[in-house]
Amino acid sequence: MTDKTHNNDLTGPVPGNAGVEASIENMEAMGLDPENLDMILNGTVEGLMSDYPALRTDDTADMMISKARSLIGTVVEYEELRMMYACALKEIKAKFDVLNTEFKVRYSRNPISFINTRLKKTVSISEKLGRKNLAFSVENIEKHINDVAGIRVICSYVDDIYAIEEALLKQSDVVLVCRKDYISAPKPNGYRSLHLIVKIPVHFAEHKREMKVEVQIRTIAMDFWASLEHQLKYKQEIAMQEEIVEELRQCADIINMTDERMMNIRHRIEAGTKAPTEDELMFEKLCKLDINLE
């Protein structure tokens, strides 16, 4: 079944009362205040009528109220879009959970330490569109914002990052849109991580929708460095900021060397382990029957 189409033209058809009431009931969940929105819409109409008495006609008032209601219709569409991105996060997280469980059974260890997901806040989406000189609309969000839905996968070792990436991209329903490897080519400030933009299908009750998700894969050490650097980025007027930036960059290099050494030590341990006997292999298989898959 084809995707539902959306109309964001403020002069387009006005949603029914049921749709408007439903959107108002759910606005608080979106971080919007329905009372404030109602005041803004009513105030806009009344303010224009007061400033321009010639506009005070039934036809003009109806037209302006129609546009205001259409704006609420756009909010309804935006709410639906956020729901679809939230579902996309559930789908992509399930894929990583399955891979982690498989690795645990096949290789007796989990390459993924933990997973975080997030939906970009409305104000952040609006600011990003503004920087691109784009209007706030469902179409612009889908076309120009790649990181509305984001998932961060934290691994123990650097080679786990690429193993997880390879396993994900082998899946037939995962389409790679963009890849940026900041591990092999770090940012000037020392930031390291693997970034992917992928498209995955999400099946809803009446249609299927291809949704974009930003995937960040990094080690535990890369992640705690990035968390501290993120704090610095959004703090204003920090004393000795240049010195802190330089020290963070140096720490990034040290963390990278530590990640490499830890991975090499693991490889040496694995290489130095003697080949198991047939009885040991059988015992290991029996133990795996009781493995905790949670």
What are the residue ranges of the model-derived segments?
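Accessory alpha/beta interaction modules
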Residues: 133-138, 150, 161-162, 184
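An acidic, glycine-/histidine-flanked metal-binding catalytic module
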Residues: 37, 41-89, 96-102, 213-294
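Terminal, regulation- and interaction-focused segments at domain boundaries
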Residues: 148-154
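Short charge-dense sequence patches
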Residues: 71-81, 110-119, 145-147, 203-216
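Long beta-strand-rich cores associated with HINT superfamily self-processing modules
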Residues: 142, 155-264
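Active-site acidic/histidine clusters and adjacent loop/turn architecture
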Residues: 79-125, 130-140, 147
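Intrinsically disordered, low-complexity terminal tails and inter-domain linkers enriched
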Residues: 4-55
